[in-house]
Amino acid sequence: LFRSIGILVIVCIAVSRPHSASAQSIDELATVCAGCHGENGVPIDKTIPNIWGQKRYYLLNQMRLFKIGHRKNEQMAPIVEPLSQTDMEALATHFANLPWPDLQQPAAADDVKARARAALNPLNCRGCHQEHYQGDMVRPRLAGQQDEYLLKTMTDFHTGERNTYPGMVALMKSIDEGEIKSLATYLAGLKLPEHPK
């Protein structure tokens, strides 16, 4: 799962790191992000999330967390370090306004769906991530996100490696690794209705 992370760190930092963010246009800044998140919205590694069409405030808040060190990531920390508040707001708006890409992830098999739905009911994920897992202003969209990214994120909450949201840590600790895998596969294969409420 983590085999390519070291290579990505070199590519994203050595090649794409912004040196003078305030002097860069939004297109130049977005090109930096595309180094890992993909020029067409499809990330180059499945453990990296899609950010096209993701919620603006969520994107902005994650950049802030990386910048102040509350969320740890060797790739993201040096990328966001030189960004100003204006830069981060512009990037969040830019990516939020782009169309969510088709990541070509199939719907989960019936047995996986059954296991995922059984796990979802007591977790009440819809209570925060909305009826179709489309997210809201604060919470991210989960439907159609990268399978391996969802798996890694939920696993990190489960183990406590990621602890920025104590509520998520508690929820993920309440289920086992098999249920987490089923959830990731199920959510990754979901498509949103045309106008989700």
Where are the predicted features?
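Sec-dependent N-terminal signal peptides
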Residues: 5-12
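C-terminal segment of classical bacterial N-terminal signal peptides
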Residues: 12-20
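Sequence/structural segment immediately N-terminal to covalent heme-attachment motifs in c-type
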Residues: 21-40, 107-131, 146
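Gly/Gly-Pro-rich "capping" loops immediately C-terminal to redox-active cysteine motifs
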Residues: 26, 41-71, 77-82, 126, ...
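Inter-heme linker and motif-flanking segments adjacent to c-type heme-binding CXXCH motifs
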Residues: 42-43, 97-112, 131-141, 158-165, ...
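Conserved hydrophobic/aromatic "anchor" residues
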Residues: 66, 94-95, 120, 157, ...
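C-terminal capping alpha-helices of c-type cytochrome domains
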Residues: 81-104, 148, 173-197
